[in-house]
Amino acid sequence: VIQIGCDPKADSTMNLLGGEPLRPVMNYMREEDEEPEYLEDIAKEGFGNVLCIETGGPTPGLGCAGRGIIATFQLLEDLKLFETYKPDVVLYDVLGDVVCGGFAAPIREDYAEKVLIVTSGEKMALYAADNISKAVQNFEDRSYARVFGIVLNHRNVENETEKVQNFAKERGFDIVGEI
């Protein structure tokens, strides 16, 4: 299993790494002023032998985080990540406000076949889930990834299960798991 955090906050893999932050790819490139030569320069094995990678983002106020994701994905191809590790599953933790095409790269660049949307019943989580579902829908006619289902991440919100069930039903998705 590989988990790639695609959020400038670079906090996707922290729990898998025992609370230790992972140096994001964009930070590596900015600080070293070159691309890494080896996957080991930007990846670390975490809990359950999950290989962890974080894209990170640009210097605040400069650059485009979406372009950083695209650059990271190209780098991972150049470093032959998928050929080397031959993962059964790759998890892309994408930013919920998929307003930028770069953030949708895992969905539209043939990196993903199935999209699992993890959401709670919180208003902003459902908003982000809706954005992700719309991003996937925008690429439906191109045979890119499709939504496989919803994973309900319980946060003890009032009427949470009902809210997420309604959200899923309105969009024609199944709730395939609960946390």
Each PLM stretch: what is its role?
Residues 2-55:
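N-terminal phosphate/diphosphate-binding loop that engages ATP/GTP or pyrophosphate donors
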Residues 6, 66-70, 126, 130:
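Electropositive phosphate-/nucleotide-binding environments in soluble metabolic enzymes
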Residues 8-10, 57, 96, 156:
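Short, glycine/acidic-enriched loop or turn micro-motifs at the edges of active sites
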Residues 12, 53, 72, 93, ...:
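Residue-level signature of catalytic and energy-coupling elements of molecular machines
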Residues 54-57, 119:
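Flexible glycine-/small-residue-rich
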Residues 57-67, 123-124:
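Flexible beta-alpha connector loops of hexameric P-loop NTPases
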Residues 69-78:
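Conserved helicase/translocase P-loop NTPase motor core
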Residues 78-89, 94-178:
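Conserved catalytic-core segment of NTP-binding enzymes
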